[in-house]
Every structure is written in C-alpha cells, then in structure tokens.
C-alpha cells in the first residue's frame, strides 16, 4: 500500500503541494490528473526521491516503510521510480545488454555477484512471456524505432527484471 498523508512540498521556495493525502491499496490503479502546475510531477518526483524538492510536512509510506527515509536506490528497488515520458533511444546497444547490465548493477549494489547467463536468460524469458513480448525484442537497439507502446512495454520489462 502507498499512503501519502498531508504532504506539503516546496520547490525553490514556492509551495507546490499543500496538504495532499492519497491512499493506493495493493492491486489498485490510479490516474493522477489535473491542470498544468497542479503538482502531478512534483508528487511523482518526491515519491521517487528526485533532488530539488523540499518536503516541509507530511508522510509517505510504502508497504509500511517510510519512503522519505529511503535512498533513491532503495525506492527504485521497491518499485518507486519514474519512467521517462519520452524514453531515450540508444542506437547500437541491444536491449539484452542493457537489461543484463542494469540487473547486475542492482545486484552489485546489494552485495550480490553477477547473475549467471543461464539464470539471466531464464528470468528474461519468464518476463517476456508475462509481458507477451517476442524474444526478438531483445536483439533490437534500446528504444530505436520503437512505437510508443513498445517503449512503454520495454520500460515495464526493465522494471520487472
């Protein structure tokens, strides 16, 4: 469960969020909507731990943990991260290499050894099947020539791995 209680946030001295409260239960999907400048991106940035946002009051808890006390890496590992609205293309870098490098960097941060190739391929195949994605996707350059939907599925695949 994600719970935001009476959250107040300033950016460069300007009050952006003024007492926001929100509860999202496991399995629920919510859309945060509002006009430009309402604080949608600010809320996402604060939850993800982006620098430059000052929480002046309130709490954020995720699965019983105080999000505001978590490092950015801890938040990302817990699934609290921001996806790019327009993911960058990386010509010449295949998805399979990016996925393995990202996973091994995460494992290294936790003090774990690199994942063996057979174990990595098993994990990737499971996640591809879950996402209903073809394995040829792995050989394509990261986001290069992808449709909008493919870019989003690629981001979800990265998150799952």
PLM features per residue range, with description:
Residues 88-161:
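ABC-family P-loop ATPase nucleotide-binding domains
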Residues 31, 68, 76-85:
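ABC nucleotide-binding domain signature
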């Amino acid at each position: 469960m994600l719970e935001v209680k009476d959250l107040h946030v300033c950016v460069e001295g300007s009050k952006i969020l003024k007492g926001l409260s929100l509860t999202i239960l496991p399995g629920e999907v919510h859309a945060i909507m509002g006009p430009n400048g309402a604080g949608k991106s600010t809320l996402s940035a604060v939850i993800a731990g982006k620098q430059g946002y000052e929480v002046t009051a309130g709490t954020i808890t995720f699965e019983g943990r105080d999000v505001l006390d978590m490092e950015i890496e801890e938040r990302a590992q817990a699934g609290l991260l921001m996806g790019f609205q327009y993911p960058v293309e990386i010509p010449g870098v295949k998805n399979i290499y990016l996925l393995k490098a990202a996973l091994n960097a995460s494992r290294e941060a936790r003090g774990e050894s690199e994942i063996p190739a057979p174990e990595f391929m098993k994990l990737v195949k499971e996640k591809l099947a879950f996402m209903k994605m073809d394995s040829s996707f792995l050989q394509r350059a990261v986001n290069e020539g992808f449709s909008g939907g493919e870019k989003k599925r690629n981001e979800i695949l990265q998150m799952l791995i």
